[in-house]
Each structure stands twice: as C-alpha cells, then as structure tokens.
C-alpha cells in the first residue's frame, strides 16, 4: 500500500464487528493521490494524502 511521502500516513488494520460480535480483520486506507509537485525546482511525482494537499504542504506543478 502506498504511503504519503509528506507525513508518512499509511493504512491501519483493525477489527470489524458483526451484530453477533464476530470479528473480521479490515483495513482503513488513507486518501492517497499521485501529484506532480515541484521539489528543488524539478517536477516530481509524489504520493500525497488529501489532508496534506488541503493544508498546502505541497506546491503542485501546473
């Protein structure tokens, strides 16, 4: 699974409980986007989560 290149956020695992309290393992995935960004004056493709995009931690390349 991809991780955010800015904050390092990745998927986490936990249990999904049914009505009878049976447990099955499930996974929560972050909202990861591939973004062309400017890093040190060059265009680079990064995996960035939506929270970092909204916060403006990445300068997007147009």
UniProtKB/Swiss-Prot annotation:
Keywords: Ribonucleoprotein, Ribosomal protein
Molecular functions per Gene Ontology: structural constituent of ribosome
GO BP annotations, alphabetical order: translation
Domain of life, source organism: Bacteria
Name of one Pfam family that matches: Ribosomal_L28
GO cellular component, one term: ribosome
NCBIfam families, per database record: L28
HAMAP family tied to this protein: Ribosomal_bL28
Membership in a protein family: Belongs to the bacterial ribosomal protein bL28 family.
Descriptive protein name: Large ribosomal subunit protein bL28
Biological classification of the source: Bacteria, Bacillati, Bacillota, Clostridia, Thermoanaerobacterales
């Amino acid at each position: 699974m991809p991780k955010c290149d800015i904050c390092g956020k990745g998927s986490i695992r936990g249990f999904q409980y049914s009505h009878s309290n049976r447990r099955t393992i499930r996974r929560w995935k972050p909202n990861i986007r591939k973004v062309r960004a400017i890093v040190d004056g060059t265009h680079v493709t990064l995996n960035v989560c939506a929270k970092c995009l909204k916060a403006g931690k990445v300068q997007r390349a147009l």
